């Protein structure tokens, strides 16, 4: 490769100048010679035409064509090698005589508008040259300046045109080009001979030296460059030979050193083998210690949590018995201490998982606003108990449908807000959620938690995110905790691709903020209620806390309401309002029933009064509703709570659902599928009043067989059924030719965001949450009735939820509403629930006895569904909690307190139901 490159460079350096110079000289001489030939031809033509013009002056004066014709013919024959034609034109530009009638004389004639030449003119056209000169009488001198055109025309007798042939010039040019090319090729050949000789004298020795260097590279250190060389090549030869001699000496010395090093290495290897054996033993001991540590943590999770759950469970059971105040106080202390210890154990286990890298984040679709609303609602109790106002402000540009780990996000919020509650004695705890960055597939959100607590001194801020450390050692004694909460929070935020920081001033409060990255979910998970009915309505809003008021006003600004805000009720402009939202301060501790005059005045000023109550005031909700309050909302107010309450005003003003008569039944054939007899009976009873034909199936197999026999306008499908679940049944039904377009509605009590998307992706047209309410079902039937034009999924509009006391054992009004106001149906549903309780009790008692029976989660799910239609909210919530824990992987033995509480609640339900059923 090197030889070829050198050869090519030498050839280029030799040939390029030769070719370039020869080419330039050839072009110069050819062009110069061509111009000389043309000039010679032009001079020859001039020597012919100018004497001819003088000679023809006399003949033109006499108009003697014959004499002039003979003259030009003689000249044409004498110069026939270059002359093609000679033509004479008179003073009127007419052909007078020509020497060659075979050529078109008009090519030599001047144009009609071209003046006669006053002297010799030359024109060229391709291989033709035309010379023209005037014929002037002897009385005219060219040096004179004629005073008029008339005088010129009198002295101008005509002109002579001579046409010359340039082909001979072209031929001579080609001949000289050919000679130039031959000479240039000859020079190139001579240059090639010299270049070849030079390359042989240079590349030959170089090739010899390259071969010698290659032999030296292969280890033949005795190789030398031989032969006679000139100049620098001889110097290079001597250098290579000297290098080979040096390499040979170095190689000999190196070999000696290698032998010595090999001997030393053998001794070192023997020592390393001994050390490796010791390291291997130490590694095995370390692995065994790590294994024992992992087993210890796993055992601690079970051995500590199980007895703690037992302590908590039996403490709760004991608290339900008759106790003295001292005993109740002691038991409450035991329960709080056990819960604190359980929280510490959970923190330690989470920290261990994070340290080991075994904590895996989920990636599921979820509604961001509902998720944050849920965790803030849980934290509101402890915040309001301390008299702290808790607010949640989610900016309107923050996307709601996202994909991530909602439980870990809630854990982060819980840790940060829990710390804020712990270290704040009065004031506010404000949560602000903003969009930081947005792309087509991802969103980065920033969450700020601001409190008015004790703050953190600057000297203690550096160790805030260290494990088992707190800013002040006395904090753990006063407030409890392990110092792991912020460490776990920081690691969770980092796992979500974000970071966390804070700013704090002693005695002024702290602000913690973090940002995380979430994927955008293109599908709609939850749509809010329609607020168009609020257009043109006036709302009076009273809230003494400015931060809480601002958050609520931001929500109201997204509605068409006209809002009148006042920080106090007394400052509210006296007028009549369509709606009024009255916020009660969290520091207000008097019973609201004592504010009778104030509430009565508020009721008189509006058609629909809503109260925003702190948690400790919720006990008065039922009594307040009896006094004319339209809705009692739990603080902090969020869109998921406030907007449905506002739209309830529309239903308060007009009844959108008219009683269904036999004549108003929808012309539909609907099939309902549910393995729970109570659920199936209720759905069937509701459908009988709304549609003309109803088919009931208690299994997925039966539903598929019935779908083969007849077409349906709509199918209500339970999801969790034995043998064949609702998703599989939906797939098989849609495979039937006459059922391909039949809408299948998923009926589920687990309307979690991720499951909703899974159901819609599996072929379900829509979903209906349990417990089924009459108004929801009727709206669904209206949208999917034949001819309604609904061909794609439509999100079920929100129906206002009734106020339910979650701690009520039996709410007969709720049971009646769930049974569409039918007393007999409500009694039947309650009786079916009581008949099912013994089976559940046996299974739960087997679990508590350590027998680990199969099918517990399915039985709890079935009980959960039955509770949804029987007006037993407390037992329904217990079933939901137990089922969620079991499906999330929690072991049955870890749920011992909840199962004991469920057994106790079964007894309470049976006792309360006996009073109604007799």
Swiss-Prot record:
Domain Histidine kinase per the UniProt entry, residue ranges = 299-520
Q: Which GO terms describe its cellular component?
A: plasma membrane
Enzyme Commission number: 2.7.13.3
Q: Which residues lie on this side of the membrane: Periplasmic?
A: 32-175
Annotated positions of the 4-aspartylphosphate modification: 718
Please report the record's description of how this protein sits within the membrane: Multi-pass membrane protein
Which residues face the membrane's Cytoplasmic side? 1-10, 197-918
Indicate the enzyme's highest-level EC class.
Answer: transferase
Keywords annotated in UniProt: ATP-binding, Cell inner membrane, Cell membrane, Kinase, Membrane, Nucleotide-binding, Phosphoprotein, Transcription, Transcription regulation, Transferase, Transmembrane, Transmembrane helix, Two-component regulatory system
Q: Please describe what this protein does.
A: Member of the two-component regulatory system UvrY/BarA involved in the regulation of carbon metabolism via the CsrA/CsrB regulatory system. Phosphorylates UvrY, probably via a four-step phosphorelay.
| PANTHER family given in the database record | HYBRID SIGNAL TRANSDUCTION HISTIDINE KINASE J (PTHR45339:SF1)
The protein in question is named: Signal transduction histidine-protein kinase BarA
């Amino acid at each position: 490769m090197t030889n070829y490159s050198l050869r090519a460079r030498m050839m280029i350096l030799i040939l390029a100048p030769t070719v370039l110079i020869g080419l330039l000289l050839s072009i110069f001489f050819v062009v110069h010679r061509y111009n000389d030939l043309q000039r010679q031809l032009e001079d020859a033509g001039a020597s012919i035409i100018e004497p001819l013009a003088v000679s023809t002056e006399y003949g033109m004066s006499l108009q003697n064509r014959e004499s002039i014709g003979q003259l030009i013919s003689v000249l044409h024959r004498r110069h026939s090698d270059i002359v093609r034609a000679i033509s004479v034109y008179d003073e009127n530009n007419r052909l007078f005589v020509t020497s060659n009638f075979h050529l078109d004389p008009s090519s030599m004639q001047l144009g009609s508008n071209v003046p006669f030449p006053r002297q010799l003119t030359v024109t060229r056209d391709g291989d033709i040259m035309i010379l023209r000169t005037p014929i002037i009488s002897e009385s005219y001198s060219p040096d004179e300046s004629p005073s008029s055109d008339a005088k010129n025309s009198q002295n101008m007798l005509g002109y002579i045109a001579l046409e010359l042939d340039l082909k001979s010039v072209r031929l001579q040019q080609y001949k000289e080009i050919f000679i130039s090319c031959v000479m240039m090729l000859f020079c190139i050949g001579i240059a090639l001979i010299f270049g070849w000789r030079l390359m042989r004298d240079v590349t030959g020795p170089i090739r010899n030296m390259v071969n010698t260097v290659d032999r030296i590279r292969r280890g033949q250190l005795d190789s030398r460059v031989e032969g006679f060389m000139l100049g620098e090549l001889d110097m290079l030869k001597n250098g290579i030979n000297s290098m080979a001699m040096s390499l040979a000496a170095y190689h000999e010395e190196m070999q000696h050193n290698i032998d010595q090093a090999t001997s030393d290495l053998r001794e070192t290897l023997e020592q390393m083998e001994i050390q490796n054996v010791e390291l291997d033993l130490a590694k095995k001991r370390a692995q065994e210690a790590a294994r024992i540590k992992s087993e210890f943590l796993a055992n601690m999770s079970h051995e500590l949590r199980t007895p703690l759950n037992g302590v908590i469970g039996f403490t709760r059971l004991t608290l339900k018995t008759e106790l003295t105040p001292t005993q109740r106080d002691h038991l409450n202390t035991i329960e709080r201490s056990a819960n604190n210890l359980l929280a510490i154990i959970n923190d330690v286990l989470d920290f261990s998982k994070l340290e080991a890298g075994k904590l895996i984040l989920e990636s599921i679709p979820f509604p961001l606003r509902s998720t944050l609303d849920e965790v803030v609602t849980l934290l509101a109790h402890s915040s309001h108990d301390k008299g702290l106002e808790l607010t949640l402000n989610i900016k309107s540009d923050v996307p709601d449908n996202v994909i991530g780990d909602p439980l870990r996000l809630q854990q982060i919020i819980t840790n940060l807000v829990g710390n804020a509650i712990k270290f704040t004695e009065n004031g506010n705890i404000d949560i602000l959620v903003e969009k930081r960055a947005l792309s087509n597939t991802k969103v980065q959100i920033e969450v700020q938690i601001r409190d008015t607590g004790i703050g953190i001194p600057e000297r203690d801020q550096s160790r805030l995110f260290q494990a088992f450390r707190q800013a002040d050692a006395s904090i753990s004694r006063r407030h409890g905790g392990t110092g792991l909460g912020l460490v776990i929070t920081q690691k969770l935020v980092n796992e979500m691709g974000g970071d966390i920081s804070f700013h704090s001033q002693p005695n002024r409060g702290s602000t913690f903020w973090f940002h995380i990255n979430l994927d955008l979910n293109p599908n709609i998970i939850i749509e809010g209620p329609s607020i168009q009915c609020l257009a043109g309505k006036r709302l009076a809003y009273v809230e003494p806390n400015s931060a809480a008021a601002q958050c609520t006003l931001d929500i109201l600004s997204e509605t068409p309401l006209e809002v009148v805000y006042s920080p106090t009720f007394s400052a509210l402009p006296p007028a009549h309002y369509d709606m009024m939202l009255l916020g009660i301060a969290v520091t207000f501790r008097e019973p609201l029933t004592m504010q009778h005059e104030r509430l009565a005045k508020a009721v008189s000023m509006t058609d629909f009064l809503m109260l925003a109550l702190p948690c400790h005031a919720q006990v008065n909700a039922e009594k307040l509703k009896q006094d004319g309050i339209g809705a009692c909302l739990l603080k902090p107010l969020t869109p998921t709570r406030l907007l449905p309450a506002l739209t309830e005003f529309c239903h308060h003003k007009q009844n959108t659902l008219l009683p269904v008569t036999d004549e108003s039944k929808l012309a539909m054939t609907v099939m309902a599928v549910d393995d729970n007899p109570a659920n199936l009976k209720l759905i069937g009873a509701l459908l009988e009043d709304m549609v003309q034909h109803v088919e009931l199936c208690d299994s997925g197999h039966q539903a598929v067989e019935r779908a083969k026999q007849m077409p349906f306008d709509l199918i209500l499908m339970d999801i969790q059924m034995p043998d064949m679940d609702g998703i599989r049944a939906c797939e098989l039904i849609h495979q039937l030719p006459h059922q391909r377009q039949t809408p299948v509605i998923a009926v589920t009590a687990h309307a979690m965001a991720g499951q909703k998307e899974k159901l819609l992706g599996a072929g379900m047209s829509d979903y209906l949450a349990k417990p089924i309410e009459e108004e929801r079902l009727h709206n669904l039937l209206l949208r999917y009735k034949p001819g309604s034009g609904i061909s794609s999924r439509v999100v079920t509009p929100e129906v206002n939820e009734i106020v339910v006391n979650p701690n009520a054992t039996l709410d007969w009004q709720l049971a009646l509403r769930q049974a569409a106001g039918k007393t007999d149906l409500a009694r039947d549903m309650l009786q079916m629930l009581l008949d099912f309780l013994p089976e559940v009790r046996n299974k739960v008692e087997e679990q508590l006895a350590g027998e680990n029976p199969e099918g517990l989660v399915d039985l709890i799910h079935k009980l959960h569904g039955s509770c949804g239609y029987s007006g037993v909210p407390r037992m329904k919530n217990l079933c939901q909690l137990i089922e969620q824990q079991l499906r999330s992987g929690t072991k049955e033995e870890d749920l011992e307190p909840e199962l004991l509480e469920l057994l106790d609640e079964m007894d309470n339900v049976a006792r309360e139901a006996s009073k109604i059923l007799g």
